[in-house]
């Protein structure tokens, strides 16, 4: 007797009874069962075992044998395969292996295939209980946002409030740190960023896209009228019509134009979650369809990636410092923290919320001094106190050179590091001392450049040279955001690492950090970050190969289209037909030297743009170019898949309404980006992994991004390939199972409670301090899998990722770049920024330097506009005559000379365009400098898009599209020259320019 055959027959025979029993006890399952009428055939390939099932709106009739015309066929190669794949629990490694080797096949109507596979999956998942009942009749769910985890309270199908998570006695103990005779323990709460607490308001925004829409003068079978994009109205259409138009257009583009005709574009970030994130569901969709990839530049790491990296490596961190062990080292050893273009109280370490604020208070309590080098007296400076040096924007490198001059002149540098751990110092020293060019980089020399008095520069150099100093650069203290994003960002980042090298980078109390990073959380507990690609199956453009692809078996996906275009140059690609870019690829320092060109040989130019996610008009330099691009006849079809009617959505031909993360299932960990930011959880006081519950049903007819992609793929015959038969909840379970969570908490308990706190590292096994190993000449002892083994020039774990294995004051990698680039030479030289105060005629026309740093109250554009609660914050927008205007901060002297009053409407303009803002007159800026955060979600031109003043607040209309250096795509978009005047009501770019 063939036991396996009998077992398979019994399973197939029992299946209708199992469905019926489940339907009897689960109204949700019964409703799903009643959706379809179809015949499903399950069989072996040779037909020796076969059974078919006739589903009729809830009724099931099952018969032995083959049906003459089934709607769906599930066919197994043999009995062994069938038994393995139908016996719970499902082993996805076996499922994927069988599918890839054609041992199992699903054939028939894609929509019915999806329904049947989900019916089988729901036998288990429809019994899962989620959330916790509250005394007031609400249910408490959890969510993970870009700024941290939330409790979400839902009653009668609506979100009534959100709140931070307060940990209980059931959660692990919190770590304690001892420093200088004191003990410090962080509060047992998850302190999120302000924008996280605004999420409820944007879920119910009046600007939500609730129905599929088509531009009224767009006819996919006739006149498309691209010139009217941005001004035409829209009409509501059904999902079937919308999906039919999009899927047919995808096929038409491929058939008429060939590979590369479809481009897939997205913002830097979107909604949180390992399943729904752009590197996950969207990446899988793009690979499934075949698209020209619009490649991001390292837009928050620019100077570090294109510059600092070449001195010491860390390419897998895009040139930024790691920060391991930095908190304890700083509290115990540091005497001074220099916040150089670093405002962590505004940018929250990117994802870390306000977790680090109390740590900066600890430093203050311990008497650690603070100095702030920033054109703006930032919220961090106001919070921590200390000396403020209001440097002229773009001239930071000059100040850094003068510090090094004093250190050399007065022997205030770490000779041990310079002589034993570095190369090229003599050549660098000759430049600093003026032997190379005849210009000694004295404090007096820098005063003319920076506006910092020579006596203060010299005093800073001496103070720094005699103390143990932590240098905080950018958002998280180790290189991310800040001055690396302006015209001299490459110089600045290179200067910062050379400052650190001269002071003995890695010795006790000397490192990068602003107390945002380096907490003693357990970093070895595995949970995949969003950078690992989620469900994408993409191995090259994500960090999936590191852990995720092995830990969570799923189908590999590959994009067969070799064409890419740099995001910053997408308008030029469309309008001019050509673009050149350089790779964002972290595996080595040299890959960035390799150019790529659009159009790629053998590929079509772009004729269809599929845009996913939130607005980018407020985050990309010279963004008015995009308005012109969207109206080009070269783009035959523009699809926008988004949540709100904002930014680029208004230029689309077809709008597909996506729901928020509160309306779908997902799973994610706070501040865990993994592939793009290894161990960023070390900026948190507690590692928190959350089930992202589907708190409410999608509003209107909106759908999850995953469901939209799946629905399109069904129409292309690729639905089962895209989904692997899984819903978002199924995928979340697979992510859970791939992690270390099952060793500590059951899936059912995790679903109910909604989160898990990873126990902290024991004091005895806390991670080592970053670069200590290098300073002391030991093998590397940090828990990061890079450089890659071949990246070492000495034995594995010995030395840095450079040719010499040492810190290189004159990088060999840049020496090998031939011919030498004058704006990125191997021997770094100070040059004035092209958007600086010495720009000649341009500076006379536009005499104010405008800073546009990362947003404080919104995560990029995600929480801005659209009726968000943060609009009511007086430091974010100002309501004038019923409209919420973006804020530009202007120095008191500049405002007085121009007759501008506090909160008066002003026009900020240059030859690229104009933006109408509300003026905030302040004494926190020096004369000649203005400040306005980037990342407005609203783009509201008063007239023709791209050629009229914007009242939405897109300050990046004014920023230059010029790269920091030739041979890079290093954006210089955080600094520009403008003029500011009282708003006169002009409505065209020509009038504004005049």
Predicted features along the sequence, with ranges:
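Feature captures hydrophobic
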Residues: 1-127
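Short acidic-glycine loop/turn motifs at beta-strand connectors
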Residues: 46, 54-59, 153-159, 384, ...
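N-terminal export/assembly segments and adjacent metallocofactor-ligating motifs
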Residues: 126-412, 538-542, 547, 552, ...
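Long, contiguous, secondary-structure-rich segments that constitute the structural scaffold
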Residues: 182-194, 689-760, 861-994
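N-terminal leader/propeptide and maturation segments of large enzyme subunits in energy/redox metabolism
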Residues: 197-241, 245, 259, 273, ...
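Extended redox/cofactor-interaction regions of prokaryotic respiratory oxidoreductases
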Residues: 278-373, 398-401, 497-650, 660, ...
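Acidic, Ser/Thr-rich peripheral helices and adjacent loops at domain boundaries
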Residues: 391, 526-537, 655-681, 922, ...
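Glycine/threonine-rich phosphate-binding loop and adjacent beta-strand/alpha-helix elements that clamp
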Residues: 662-698, 713, 810
């Amino acid at each position: 007797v063939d036991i396996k055959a009998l077992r398979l027959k019994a399973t197939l025979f029992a299946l209708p009874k199992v469905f019926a029993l489940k339907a009897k006890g689960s109204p949700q399952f019964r409703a799903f069962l009643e959706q379809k009428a179809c015949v499903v055939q399950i069989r072996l390939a040779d037909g020796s075992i076969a059974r078919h099932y006739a589903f009729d709106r809830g009724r099931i009739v099952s018969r032995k044998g083959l049906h003459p015309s089934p709607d769906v066929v599930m066919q197994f190669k043999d009995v062994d395969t069938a038994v393995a794949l139908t016996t719970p629990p499902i082993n996805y490694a076996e499922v994927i292996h069988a599918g890839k080797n054609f041992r199992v096949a699903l054939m028939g109507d894609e929509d019915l295939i999806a329904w049947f596979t989900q019916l089988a999956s729901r036998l288990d998942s429809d019994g899962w209980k989620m959330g916790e009942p509250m005394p007031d009749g609400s249910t408490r769910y959890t969510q993970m946002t870009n700024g941290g985890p939330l409790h979400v309270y839902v009653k009668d199908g609506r979100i009534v409030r959100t709140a931070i998570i307060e940990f209980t006695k059931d959660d692990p103990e919190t770590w304690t740190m001892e420093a200088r005779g004191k003990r410090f323990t962080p509060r047992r709460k998850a302190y999120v960023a302000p924008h996280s607490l605004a999420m409820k308001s944007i879920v119910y925004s009046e600007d939500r896209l609730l129905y599929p829409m088509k531009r009224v003068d767009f006819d996919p079978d006739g006149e498309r009228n691209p010139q009217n994009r941005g001004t035409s109205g829209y009409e509501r259409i059904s999902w079937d019509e919308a999906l039919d138009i999009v899927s047919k257009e995808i096929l038409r583009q491929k058939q008429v134009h060939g590979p590369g005709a479809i481009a897939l574009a997205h913002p830097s970030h979107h909604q949180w979650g390992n399943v729904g994130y752009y590197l996950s569901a969207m990446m899988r969709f793009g690979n499934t369809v075949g698209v020209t990839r619009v490649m991001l530049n390292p837009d928050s790491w620019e100077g570090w990636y294109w510059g600092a990296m070449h001195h010491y490596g860390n390419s897998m961190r895009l040139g930024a410092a790691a920060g391991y062990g930095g908190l304890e080292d700083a509290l115990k050893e540091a005497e001074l923290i220099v916040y150089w273009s670093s405002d962590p109280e505004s940018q929250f370490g990117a994802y870390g919320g306000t977790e680090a604020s109390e740590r900066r208070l600890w430093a203050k309590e311990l008497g650690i001094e603070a100095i702030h080098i920033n054109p703006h007296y930032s919220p961090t400076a106001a919070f921590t106190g200390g000396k403020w040096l209001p440097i002229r924007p773009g001239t930071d490198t000059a100040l850094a050179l003068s510090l090094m001059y004093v250190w050399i002149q007065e022997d205030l540098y770490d000779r041990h590091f310079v002589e034993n751990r570095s190369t090229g110092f003599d050549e660098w020293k000759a430049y600093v001392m003026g032997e190379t060019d005849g210009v000694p980089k004295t404090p007096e020399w820098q005063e003319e450049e920076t506006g910092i008095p020579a006596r203060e520069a010299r005093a800073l150099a001496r103070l720094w040279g005699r103390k143990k100093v932590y240098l905080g650069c950018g958002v998280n203290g180790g290189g991310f955001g800040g001055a690396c994003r302006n015209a001299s960002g490459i110089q600045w980042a290179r200067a910062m690492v050379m400052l650190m090298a001269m002071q003995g980078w890695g010795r006790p109390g000397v490192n990068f950090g602003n107390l945002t990073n380096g907490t003693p959380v357990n970093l070895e507990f595995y949970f995949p970050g969003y950078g690992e690609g989620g469900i994408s199956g993409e191995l090259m453009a994500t960090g999936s190969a590191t852990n995720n692809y092995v830990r969570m078996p799923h189908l590999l996906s590959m994009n067969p289209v070799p064409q890419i275009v740099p995001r910053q140059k997408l308008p030029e690609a469309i309008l001019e037909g050509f673009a050149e870019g350089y790779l964002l690829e972290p595996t080595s320092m040299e890959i960035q030297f390799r150019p790529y060109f659009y159009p790629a040989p053998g590929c079509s130019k772009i004729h269809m743009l599929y845009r996913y996610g939130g607005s980018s008009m407020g985050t990309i330099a010279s963004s008015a170019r995009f308005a012109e691009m969207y109206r080009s006849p070269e783009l035959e079809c523009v699809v926008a898949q988004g949540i709100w009617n904002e930014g680029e959505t208004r230029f689309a031909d077809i709008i597909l309404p996506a729901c928020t993360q509160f309306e779908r299932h997902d799973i994610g960990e706070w501040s865990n980006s993994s592939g793009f930011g290894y161990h960023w959880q070390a900026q948190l006081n507690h590692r928190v992994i959350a089930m992202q519950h589907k708190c409410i049903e999608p509003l209107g007819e909106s759908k999850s991004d995953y469901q939209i992609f799946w629905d399109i793929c069904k129409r292309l015959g690729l639905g089962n390939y895209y989904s692997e038969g899984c819903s978002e909840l199924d995928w979340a379970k697979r992510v859970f199972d791939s992690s270390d969570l099952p060793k500590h908490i059951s899936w059912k308990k995790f679903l109910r409670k909604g989160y898990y706190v990873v126990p902290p590292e024991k004091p005895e096994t806390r991670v080592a301090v970053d670069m200590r190993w290098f300073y002391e000449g030991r093998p590397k002892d940090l828990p990061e899998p890079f450089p890659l083994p071949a990246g070492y020039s000495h034995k594995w774990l010995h030395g840095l990722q450079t040719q010499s294995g040492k810190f290189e004051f004159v990088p060999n990698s840049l020496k090998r770049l031939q011919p030498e680039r004058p704006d990125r030479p191997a021997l770094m030289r100070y040059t004035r920024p092209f958007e600086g105060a010495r720009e000649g005629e341009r500076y006379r026309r536009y005499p104010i330097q405008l800073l546009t740093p990362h947003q404080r109250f919104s995560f990029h554009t995600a929480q801005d506009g659209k009726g968000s609660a943060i609009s009511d914050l007086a430091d974010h927008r100002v309501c004038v005559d019923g409209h919420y205007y973006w804020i530009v901060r202007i120095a008191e002297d500049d405002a007085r000379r121009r007759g501008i009053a506090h909160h008066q409407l002003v026009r900020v303009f240059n030859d690229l365009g104009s933006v109408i803002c509300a003026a905030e007159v302040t004494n926190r800026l020096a004369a000649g400098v203005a400040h306005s955060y980037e990342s407005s979600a609203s783009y509201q031109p008063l007239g023709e898009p791209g050629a009229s003043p914007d009242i939405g607040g897109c300050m990046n209309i004014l920023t230059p599209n010029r790269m920091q250096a030739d041979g890079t795509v290093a954006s210089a978009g955080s600094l520009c020259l403008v003029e500011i005047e009282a708003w006169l009501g002009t409505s065209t770019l020509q009038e504004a320019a005049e």
